[in-house]
């Protein structure tokens, strides 16, 4: 054990990390627990696409804290780090790096193989940087054997999983309308779009379509005019009422428009802005059912020759029923283009309508006069065309939310394409029931998860990209039959090409392989790659190379992952193993700035974890993030709260330094025999630290990390530093081998060692540093090789409750002193306490005297002047009009007598029964008394001062100033000094006491090394001008 100085947490971090690296501590801990019970954790993989942000840091700190806790419990923790390395997050970054504008550029300017190489290089480079950032936070994970979806073994597990899906008839290829990114030129799944809706300003267009066999018009509303050239149907709700609106124009002409009756006024109000309408009226109202089957003339028939062909098909350009039609806006008639919307697609399929989606992968039209035009660039032209044909009812703008690409942030299109799907709809009910068995933290996430899953459709797993796990599906060019390959060995066996290197099965190498179909035709691989969420969904079993289900005992990610990663891994495990892949799942919130705004470059409010740790050290950030609020709530990052956390850890360090330095001075060697001599305050702190340990373990098991850290903070600040250290400070000045001193040292040693064991999961660097200084030769070499135990025999609930009362009393005395401006250095002659706590005060009154600086404690009812105040609210309920008579009866009895009578229950006066709740007794307190209420009654403090009180207070004033001067001179604790005091005359007893407290000798003359002059003002307004000289005792 060595003496301890002040701490710099950043430097401490570096020192401890160097120690761990030198001693290979992480691996030693794993080896130590190798035969312990297994604890399986799956790391939700961050994308290797840049530096970590504060949210990523929070996520890893949560994980590291839980896993460190499990290690010190003796568990063999399976803790592979994970990385997301495929997909659009990487591709988009590489495209930007090489100024690539399209998929075509990838193939023509750089080449597929080079692009794949660059994506791999980019991912690996960022992996290394991010790993360093995580290690800087003190994170212990198995980075050496981290799972990487770009490795062949992992990719093979993706193939094996897809083959299992195929064998269970859960894999299908289908033409469906879904999300399409025109910039990335690929389809996207619905879970990739959740949370990616942004507010946009789009056209708001009302259009009239002429009915084929009459001069009447149906009206529709759309925010995507570019889809009108592809219109195939119009939907109505059969149950709604539709009005035939006679519209008269200023030029004397008239038309009939069909609009849902409830929306007529809203639509006509808009129509009047763009048309010279003189008046309108409803001629008749019919049910939507009567409109079904009516045919209309496509509004852009001449502009799109393809529509002229479709018009010849029986059900095309017809009004059909649709349950999705509402009266929340629009006209009550819905424009339907089956190629550009899920509802549209399903309606079209139901009525055998051709799926017409005339746009290419870049989002440009392939038919009509708008051929070659990007769809959003068509809007104004389409509107102008409608105006020229007198078919526009109204045109404006509307703000609404619209889906964007989750990586490049481009507005998405709804487009019908052929894709590969996992048929989740077939197993959704099982997934929901399995999800209900998970231990969700907090428990309300279960409802959110189940509700989210209930709305998911089949999973679109195919992506028209390059950097990903290639779909292991080969399709025959002759008969269209397809086969799913489940492993590299199977592919080698089936391949026509025997010399292809399959050490890497990414594109384009795997694309070169052909198979032979049973019909004799050539089979080529479908060019698509798998959704990157499929990659991470494989993690529970692919990360450990297992084809058997091993449920994770703990996973945690941010709240955006509830229906993303939590779902994707469950879905794949359900497909393969018919079960969920995890037992306990915790959701955490997002990190925001101090005002609650999302952090972003544009707002300039991003907080870098590297910057924070450089300023504060990793442990301060770790403790702050886990204690700022409940983990599942969004966290508003605050530098002032970081300062408070650092201050709290500094308080712990100072308490440790105080303890260690005195122990070193006295050559203290820990020995459990000293526990035989503990005092009440020692027994209490031994009980408290084990109670806190018990609470901490319970909180970490849940895990409720806020409960864990709040319990630690409260113990450090209130129990240990502000209470126990103060109680035993005088014992550290006793003779070297005094049993009271030794028992205090033994208690301090035990409490600090127990405390850092509990804190080690959240403050690993600080805990390790203290442990290394305090550990004895027979202890494990690292705190993380030392098992966390709870000594229940030390826990004494009665003692803790009694001490809580004593602390309340002391706090009340301090409040009373503040009220009276009576500082703690001046003793109080007497306090009066209620008799109901006599037993507790008789046992521990000495603590009240020491900590409150009180000379005498009196246990009795305070004898002040008692007055009675009737409780008119209660009296009114019972006596109503008789209240004045009851009040008179109460006032007829002396207050002291009434109080005594009511102590034994109800009391009858003038035929009225008086109950205790009918009155309130107040005590008038004399000027020399201050009363303070606490949970058991009141503390009454006598604030009268006499000469003895003043002298004792001045002694403390002088001691405090000499100690302050010692600190200024940077003197060691045991360094003796000579002191010369002028301005106050003390008796020899008082001088002797001061000399003992400050380790000094009072002398008449000295060669001063340091002089300070002070003015002391006592509570009774006396003033003393003093001068203190100190000379080092050489």
Swiss-Prot record:
It is an enzyme of class 6 (ligase). A motif ('HIGH' region) lies at residues 46-56. It catalyses: tRNA(Ile) + L-isoleucine + ATP = L-isoleucyl-tRNA(Ile) + AMP + diphosphate. Keywords: Aminoacyl-tRNA synthetase, ATP-binding, Cytoplasm, Ligase, Metal-binding, Nucleotide-binding, Protein biosynthesis, Zinc. A motif ('KMSKS' region) lies at residues 598-602. InterPro entries: aa-tRNA-synth_I_CS (IPR001412), aa-tRNA-synth_Ia (IPR002300), Anticodon_Ile_ABEc (IPR033709), Ile-tRNA-ligase (IPR002301), Ile-tRNA-ligase_type2 (IPR023586), M/V/L/I-tRNA-synth_anticd-bd (IPR013155), Rossmann-like_a/b/a_fold (IPR014729), tRNAsynth_Ia_anticodon-bd (IPR009080). It is found in: Cytoplasm. The keyword Metal-binding applies. Its EC number is 6.1.1.5. GO terms for cellular component: cytoplasm. Pfam families: Anticodon_1 (PF08264), DUF5915 (PF19302), tRNA-synt_1 (PF00133). It comes from the Archaea. CDD domains: Anticodon_Ia_Ile_ABEc, IleRS_core. GO terms for molecular function: aminoacyl-tRNA deacylase activity; ATP binding; isoleucine-tRNA ligase activity; tRNA binding; zinc ion binding. Belongs to the class-I aminoacyl-tRNA synthetase family. IleS type 2 subfamily. IleRS has two distinct active sites: one for aminoacylation and one for editing. The misactivated valine is translocated from the active site to the editing site, which sterically excludes the correctly activated isoleucine. The single editing site contains two valyl binding pockets, one specific for each substrate (Val-AMP or Val-tRNA(Ile)). Monomer. Catalyzes the attachment of isoleucine to tRNA(Ile). As IleRS can inadvertently accommodate and process structurally similar amino acids such as valine, to avoid such errors it has two additional distinct tRNA(Ile)-dependent editing activities. One activity is designated as 'pretransfer' editing and involves the hydrolysis of activated Val-AMP. The other activity is designated 'posttransfer' editing and involves deacylation of mischarged Val-tRNA(Ile). This is Isoleucine--tRNA ligase. It comes from Methanococcus maripaludis (strain DSM 14266 / JCM 13030 / NBRC 101832 / S2 / LL).
């Amino acid at each position: 054990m060595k003496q301890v100085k002040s701490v710099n947490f950043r430097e401490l971090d570096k020192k401890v990390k160097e120690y761990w690296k030198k001693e290979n501590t992480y691996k030693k801990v794993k080896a130590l627990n190798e035969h312990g019970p297994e604890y399986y954790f799956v790391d939700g993989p961050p994308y290797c696409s840049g530096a970590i942000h504060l949210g990523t840091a929070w996520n890893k700190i949560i994980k590291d804290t839980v896993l460190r806790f499990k290690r010190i419990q003796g568990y063999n923790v399976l803790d592979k780090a994970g990385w997301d390395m495929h997909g659009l997050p990487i591709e988009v970054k590489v495209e930007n790096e090489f100024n690539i504008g399209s998929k075509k550029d990838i193939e023509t300017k750089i080449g597929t193989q080079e692009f794949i190489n660059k994506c791999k290089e980019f991912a690996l480079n960022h992996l290394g940087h991010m790993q360093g950032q995580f290690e800087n936070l003190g994170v212990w994970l198995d980075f050496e054997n981290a799972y990487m979806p770009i490795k062949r073994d992992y990719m093979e597990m993706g193939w094996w999983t897809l083959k299992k899906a195929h064998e269970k008839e859960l894999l299908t290829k289908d033409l469906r309308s879904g999300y399409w990114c025109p910039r990335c030129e690929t389809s996207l799944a619905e879970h990739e779009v959740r949370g990616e809706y942004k507010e946009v300003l789009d056209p708001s267009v009302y259009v009239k379509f002429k009915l084929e066999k009459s001069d009447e018009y149906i009206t529709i509303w759309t925010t995507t005019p570019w889809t009108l050239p592809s219109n195939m149907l119009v939907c109505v709700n059969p149950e709604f009422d539709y009005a035939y609106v006679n519209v008269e124009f200023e030029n004397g002409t008239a038309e009939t428009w069909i609009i849902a009756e409830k929306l007529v006024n809203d639509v006509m109000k808009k129509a009047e802005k763009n048309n010279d309408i003189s008046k309108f009226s409803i001629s008749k109202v019919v049910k939507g059912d009567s409109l079904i089957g009516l045919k209309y003339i496509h509004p852009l028939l001449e502009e799109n020759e393809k529509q002229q062909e479709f018009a010849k098909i029986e059900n095309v350009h017809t009004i059909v029923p649709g349950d999705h039609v509402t009266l929340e806006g629009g006209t009550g008639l819905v424009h339907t283009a089956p190629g550009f919307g899920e509802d549209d697609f399903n309606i079209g399929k139901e009525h055998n309508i051709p799926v017409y989606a005339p746009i290419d992968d870049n989002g440009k039209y392939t038919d009509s006069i708008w051929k070659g035009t990007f769809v959003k660039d068509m809007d104004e032209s389409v509107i102008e065309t409608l105006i020229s044909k007198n078919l526009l009812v109204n045109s404006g703008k509307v703000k609404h939310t619209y889906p964007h690409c989750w990586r490049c942030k481009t507005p998405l299109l709804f487009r019908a394409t052929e894709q590969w799907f996992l048929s989740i709809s077939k197993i959704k009910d099982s997934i929901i029931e399995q999800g209900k068995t998970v231990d969700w933290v907090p428990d309300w996430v279960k409802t959110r998860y189940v509700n989210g899953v209930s709305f998911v459709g089949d999973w679109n797993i195919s992506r028209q990209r390059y950097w990903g796990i290639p779909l292991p599906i080969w399709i025959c060019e002759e008969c269209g039959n397809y086969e799913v390959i489940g492993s590299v060995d199977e592919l080698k066996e089936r391949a026509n090409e025997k010399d292809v290197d399959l050490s890497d099965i990414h594109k384009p190498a795997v694309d070169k392989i052909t198979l032979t179909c049973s019909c004799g035709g050539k089979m080529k691989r479908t060019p698509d790659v798998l959704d990157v969420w499929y990659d991470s969904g494989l993690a529970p079993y692919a990360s450990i190379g297992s084809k058997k289900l091993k449920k994770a005992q703990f996973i945690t990610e941010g709240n955006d992952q509830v229906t993303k990663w939590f779902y994707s891994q469950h879905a794949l495990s359900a497909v393969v193993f018919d079960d969920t892949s995890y037992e306990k799942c915790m959701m955490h919130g997002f990190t925001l700035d101090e005002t609650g705004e999302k952090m972003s470059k544009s707002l300039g409010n991003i907080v870098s974890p590297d910057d924070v740790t450089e300023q504060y050290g990793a442990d301060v950030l770790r403790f702050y993030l886990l204690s700022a609020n409940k983990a599942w709530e969004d966290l508003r990052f605050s530098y002032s709260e970081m300062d408070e956390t650092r201050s709290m850890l500094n308080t712990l360090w100072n308490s440790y330094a105080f303890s260690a330095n005195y122990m070193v001075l006295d050559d203290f060697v820990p020995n459990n025999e000293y526990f035989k001599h503990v005092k009440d305050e020692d027994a209490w702190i031994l009980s408290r630290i084990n109670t806190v340990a018990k609470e901490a373990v319970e909180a970490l098991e849940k895990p409720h990390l806020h409960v864990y850290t709040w319990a630690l903070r409260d113990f450090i600040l209130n129990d240990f530093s502000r209470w126990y250290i103060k109680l035993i400070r005088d014992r550290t000045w006793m003779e070297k081998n005094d049993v009271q001193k030794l028992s205090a040292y033994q208690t301090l040693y035990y409490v600090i060692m127990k405390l850092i064991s509990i804190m080690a999961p959240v403050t690993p660097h600080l805990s390790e540093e203290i442990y290394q200084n305090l550990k004895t030769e027979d202890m494990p070499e690292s705190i993380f090789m030392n098992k966390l135990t709870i000594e229940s025999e030390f826990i004494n609930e009665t003692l803790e409750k009694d001490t809580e009362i004593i602390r309340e009393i002391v706090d009340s005395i301090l409040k009373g002193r503040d009220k009276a401006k009576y500082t703690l250095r001046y003793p109080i002659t007497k306090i009066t306490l209620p008799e109901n706590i006599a037993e507790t005060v008789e046992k521990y009154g000495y603590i009240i005297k020491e900590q409150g600086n009180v000379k005498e404690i009196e246990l009795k009812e305070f004898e002040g002047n008692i007055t009675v105040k009737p409780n008119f609210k209660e009296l009114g309920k019972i006596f109503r009009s008789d209240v004045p008579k009851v009040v008179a009866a109460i006032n007829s009895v002396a207050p002291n007598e009434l109080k005594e009578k009511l102590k034994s229950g109800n009391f009858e006066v003038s035929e009225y029964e008086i109950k205790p709740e009918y009155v309130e007794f107040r005590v008038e307190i004399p000027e020399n008394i201050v009363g303070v209420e606490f949970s058991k009654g009141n503390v009454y403090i006598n604030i009268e001062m006499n000469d003895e009180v003043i002298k004792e207070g001045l002694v403390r004033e002088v001691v405090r100033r000499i100690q302050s001067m010692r600190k200024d001179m940077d003197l060691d604790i045991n360094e003796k000094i000579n002191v010369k005091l002028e301005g106050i005359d003390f008796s020899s007893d008082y001088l002797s006491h001061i000399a003992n407290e400050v380790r000094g000798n009072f002398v008449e003359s000295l060669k001063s090394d340091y002089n300070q002059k002070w003015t002391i003002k006592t509570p009774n307004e006396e003033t003393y001008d003093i001068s203190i000289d100190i000379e080092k005792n050489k």
